Each structure stands twice: as structure tokens, then as C-alpha cells.
Swiss-Prot record:
It is found in: Golgi apparatus, Golgi stack membrane. Keywords: Cell wall biogenesis/degradation, Glycoprotein, Glycosyltransferase, Golgi apparatus, Membrane, Signal-anchor, Transferase, Transmembrane, Transmembrane helix. PANTHER family: FUCOSYLTRANSFERASE 2, FUCOSYLTRANSFERASE 2-RELATED. This is Fucosyltransferase 2. It comes from Arabidopsis thaliana. May be involved in cell wall biosynthesis. May act as a fucosyltransferase. It is a single-pass type II membrane protein.
Length: 539
């Protein structure tokens, strides 16, 4: 019986062993089973599923990179740790409804190459700077590199919008933009261009003369026009010209916006510019720029929105201020409302008229709910009804913040929304030259740009920056005149772009005054300043 069982077991095991050997084979050289033939016998479901996950993950990473580069507006290659905001900002704001045109992207890539070739530290830059040291005799040769230098001037909001304008001009005229500002500027903003710098070197030949540049300077464009010292012949021997385009410029300075003068400026290697204006609207009225600008910006009212997001990335120090505050006070809200309050002619304290105007605006426009009265205030909202709105207030004082905070703490709202009022700082007054003041100002502008809806004050470049970066059509609190409340208290902006506060009113061809807000449909008068100019669409 025992022998029979052993034979039966042997008869079963031998065929099975032969089948296994036939299927797998055996490599005597390395002792490993050859499984290649076996692997092809049936599909590996797990492997296919993993491949699908990898493809999906790769696509998500690709989409993430594309979002962080703002639809091609930015380029990769920067060290992420050197400028966290460049790669993280998209996580804090909704995707822009405005897409940069392919022509704008092409112009930006071409400019980046120009800046890399001609920027500080290159042989071309050194040769071009030598022209400033030579005696001005004969024609100047700058080896194809020309420059426009932005002089540090005015408050931070004005600086940001004016630099964007100068950069646009640089792209239109194939010049390299260099900005004065030194360490403080570098403390606020990351470098926008890869493998180069946009900061004017401290030892720049003319830097020591900047404080003396003015409307009566020997090389001032406007003054030379006034004295009839500038023409096609004389300009060819100039190494530089000073352009005074600040709010107080005169009729001769404003000739900068004429075609004839642009033709003269083409031949000057160095243009030194002082401006605190967003003068882009008037560039659209120069015939030689018109077609190019139209291709760069099919949506005319998005010039600062695109250029601002391209140029201005908060430094790591400022980005820390932004992200810490956002996470602490804004991240969990169902809706974020920005409220930028700037009262220019109020000596001190809180104005009851301004308070009334603010409350009327936010409630009439359904940005914040009205207060509940009577029996209704005792009804508790359900979980579904409960909605948190976080209001970010920016102001030099705390008065308006305290009023709103108390109002929405002590009273329920008719919508049962819970309203949180927050204010990051209250500096008392503008302190342009203080580093921490500017850090906070830049952080607050950026925080406002991250909100879903925004209210800004008339005339304020602080608000313009926030509106433009966010691509928002803000509600503008109209400026009070003769101590009376405007009716309506606020109105919606026509586009996200800033207002040009001091435009020229001159027809260069006819050589006479004209209303430059009625020349083309996309350059209109501003909502908050009747004489200002603004780029708009479909109005």
C-alpha cells in the first residue's frame, strides 16, 4: 500500500515539473528563471493601471507648471528658492480671464534675449557706457544696444505703474530697461529677467548727476526743444538725453509723445527718464506704435495686468508677509473682499462722510450685506446658510477698520453671512524711504490683488496696482468734492488698467490742443479723474 501511494504521487509530480521547466526554461549560466516568455502570455493589469496613473500625474505636473508660468507669460529656469512667489503665486489667486497674446509672448522672449545680450556686465553694456564718458563729437556708436533708465521717484504705487510704462516703451523701441533703486529695490522685488539684472549698477557713470537732473538741465529733452537746440543733426552727437515725464512736466516735455520726437530719440543711446505716471495710454496714440501695440494687446485694458504680473514678483521677505497673512485671515473664507481706503485731504481722524460713503458703496453694490434688525437677528443660520466673508482693509489709519469691525460684530446680517474684518497695518502716514514700510505696502497691494472683489479709492496708485495685478474691475470710491458725498458713492472700473493722471492734450500733427480722450475708442477718460486717460475695451 505504501509503494502504491508513492508511485501515484510520483506520477502526478513528474508531469507538473516537466510543464514548469518547459514554460520557464533554465539558464545554467546565471541560475535565474527566464520569465520573458511567460510575461507575454497575459496582460498585466496592475502595470497598465500604474502607467495610466503616471500619465495622469505627468499631465497634472505639466498643467501645474503651465499655471505657475501664467500661460507662457513667464519662463522657467529660475532657481525656485531665490523667488518663491514666481512659482507659488498661482496657488493664491484664480486663473486670469485675460490670456496674453502670442505676439506679446514673442516680444517678451525677444526682449529677454536683448537684455541678456546688452545688460550690465556684458561687453556691449561696457562699450555703451563708455559713450557717456567721451567728448560728444561725431556720431555715437553703441553697437546696437540702447538703454532707457528709470530714475527712482515718488511713492511705491507710482513707481510700480511707471516702471511698467517704461518697460512697455523699452519693448517698443528695442531698448534695455534699467531701474535705479539699489538694495531697497532688490529687497522688494525679484529679478524679472533670467541670468541677468535689471538693476542699474551703483557705479553708473551718470548716477552722481541724477539729483541735478531737472527741466532746466542741459540735456533735458523738453528744454532743448524750447531753446531749439535739438534736431536730427544735433541729436546724432548726443550720448544721452534726460526725459522729464513726471506729473509737473510742461508742454515741451510732453512732445515726447509726438511721432516727430520719437524719430529723433531713436538715435540717442541713453535715455534717462523721471516719471511717476502710467503713460501707456498715450503710447497707443503714437502712430508708429499703434499697430504693434494692437497685436501685443488685443484686449487693450490689460496692459498693466500682463506686464505687472510679468515684472513684479515679491521678494521672499515680502512673500512671507503675504502668505502668512493670507493663511491666517483669508484662506478659509468663502469670499474675500478687498477694501483700500486712502483719503488724501483729510488732516486726521475718521471722516463721517467717508464712513457713510464706504458703507453705502459696499452695501448698495451687494459686496457686503446690510445689518439685520428686530426679531430676525435671533434666528440662527443653518450650516448650509453659513457663509464667511473676509474683508481685507488697507488704510494708513485704523479708524474705518474699527467702525466696520464693530458694526459687523455687534449686529447679524440679513443674509446671515459671517463677516470678518482684518487690517494688516496702520502706518499713520506714507513713509516712502523706509524699507519695512515699503515691504508692508507692497505686501498689502498684493494681498488686495488676491481678493475676489475689490473696492479702491479714487486717484490712488496703491489701488491701481492691486486692481491691475488681480485683473479685477474694482469699484472705485469717488473723490468727495466740496465736502459732499458723491452720488452714487462708487462706480465700477471700465478695465483693470491704471489711470494716466497727467496726459498731454495735444494733437501733434495739427500742432494744436485737443481732447486726447476722444481720439480712439480704446483710450477714454478715467472714472475717477475726468482729465485722465485710461485703456479700455468695448466701451
Amino acid at each position: 500500500m505504501r509503494i502504491t501511494e508513492i508511485l501515484a504521487l510520483f506520477m502526478v509530480l513528474v508531469p507538473v515539473s516537466l510543464v514548469i521547466v518547459a514554460m520557464f526554461g533554465y539558464d545554467q549560466g546565471n541560475g535565474f528563471v527566464q520569465a520573458s516568455r511567460f510575461i507575454t502570455m497575459e496582460p498585466n493589469v496592475t502595470s497598465s493601471s500604474d502607467d495610466s496613473s503616471l500619465v495622469q500625474r505627468d499631465q497634472e505636473q505639466k498643467d501645474s507648471v503651465d499655471m505657475s508660468l501664467l500661460g507662457g507669460l513667464l519662463v522657467s529656469g529660475f532657481k525656485k528658492e531665490s523667488c518663491l512667489s514666481r512659482y507659488q503665486s498661482y496657488l493664491y489667486r484664480k486663473a486670469s480671464p485675460y490670456k496674453p497674446s502670442l505676439h506679446l509672448l514673442s516680444k517678451l522672449r525677444a526682449y529677454e534675449e536683448l537684455h541678456k545680450r546688452c545688460g550690465p556686465g556684458t561687453r556691449q553694456y561696457t562699450n555703451a557706457e563708455r559713450l557717456l564718458k567721451q567728448k560728444q563729437t561725431g556720431e555715437m556708436e553703441s553697437q546696437g544696444c540702447k538703454y532707457v533708465v528709470w530714475m527712482s521717484f515718488s511713492g511705491l504705487g507710482n513707481r510700480i505703474i511707471s516702471i511698467a510704462s517704461v518697460f512697455l516703451y523699452a519693448m517698443l523701441t528695442d531698448r534695455v530697461l534699467l531701474v535705479e533703486g539699489g538694495e531697497q529695490f532688490a529687497d522688494l522685488f525679484c529679478e524679472p529677467f533670467l541670468d541677468t539684472t535689471w538693476l542699474l549698477p551703483k557705479d553708473f557713470t551718470l548716477a552722481s548727476q541724477f539729483s541735478g537732473f531737472g527741466q532746466n538741465s542741459a540735456h533735458c529733452h523738453g528744454d532743448m526743444l524750447k531753446r531749439k537746440l535739438i534736431n536730427e543733426s544735433s541729436v546724432s552727437s548726443l550720448s544721452h538725453l534726460y526725459l522729464h515725464l513726471a506729473h509737473d512736466y510742461n508742454e515741451h516735455d510732453k512732445m515726447f509723445f509726438c511721432e516727430e520726437d520719437q524719430n529723433l530719440l531713436k538715435n540717442v543711446p541713453w535715455l534717462i527718464m523721471r516719471t511717476n505716471n502710467f503713460f501707456a495710454p498715450s503710447l497707443f496714440l503714437i502712430s508708429s506704435f499703434e499697430e504693434e501695440l494692437g497685436m501685443m494687446f488685443p484686449e487693450k485694458g490689460t496692459v498693466f495686468h500682463h506686464l505687472g504680473r510679468y515684472l513684479f514678483h515679491p521678494s521672499n521677505q515680502v512673500w512671507g508677509l503675504i502668505t502668512r497673512y493670507y493663511q491666517a485671515y483669508l484662506a478659509k473664507a468663502d469670499e474675500r473682499i478687498g477694501l483700500q481706503i486712502r483719503v488724501f485731504d483729510e488732516k486726521s481722524g475718521v471722516s463721517p462722510r467717508v464712513t457713510k460713503q464706504i458703507i453705502s458703496c459696499v452695501q448698495n453694490e451687494n459686496l457686503l450685506p446690510r445689518l439685520s434688525k428686530g426679531e430676525e437677528q435671533y434666528k440662527q443660520p443653518s450650516e448650509e446658510e453659513l457663509k464667511l466673508k473676509s474683508v481685507l482693509v488697507t488704510s494708513l489709519t485704523t479708524g474705518y477698520f474699527e467702525i466696520l469691525k464693530t458694526m459687523y460684530w455687534e449686529n447679524p446680517t440679513v443674509t446671515r453671512d459671517v463677516i470678518g474684518i482684518h487690517q494688516p497695518s496702520h502706518e499713520g502716514h506714507q513713509q516712502t524711504e523706509k524699507l519695512m514700510h515699503n515691504r508692508k505696502a507692497w505686501a498689502e497691494m498684493y494681498l488686495l490683488s488676491l481678493t475676489d472683489k475689490l473696492v479702491i479709492s479714487a486717484w490712488s496708485t496703491f489701488g491701481y496696482v492691486a486692481q491691475g495685478l488681480g485683473g479685477l474691475r474694482a469699484w472705485i470710491l469717488y473723490k468727495q468734492e466740496n465736502q459732499t458725498n458723491p452720488n452714487p458713492p462708487c462706480g465700477r472700473a471700465m478695465s483693470p488698467d491704471p489711470c494716466f493722471h497727467a496726459p498731454p492734450y495735444y494733437d501733434c500733427k495739427a500742432k494744436k490742443g485737443t481732447d486726447t480722450g476722444n481720439v480712439v475708442p480704446h483710450v477714454r477718460h478715467c472714472e475717477d479723474i475726468s482729465w485722465g486717460l485710461k485703456l479700455v475695451d468695448n466701451f
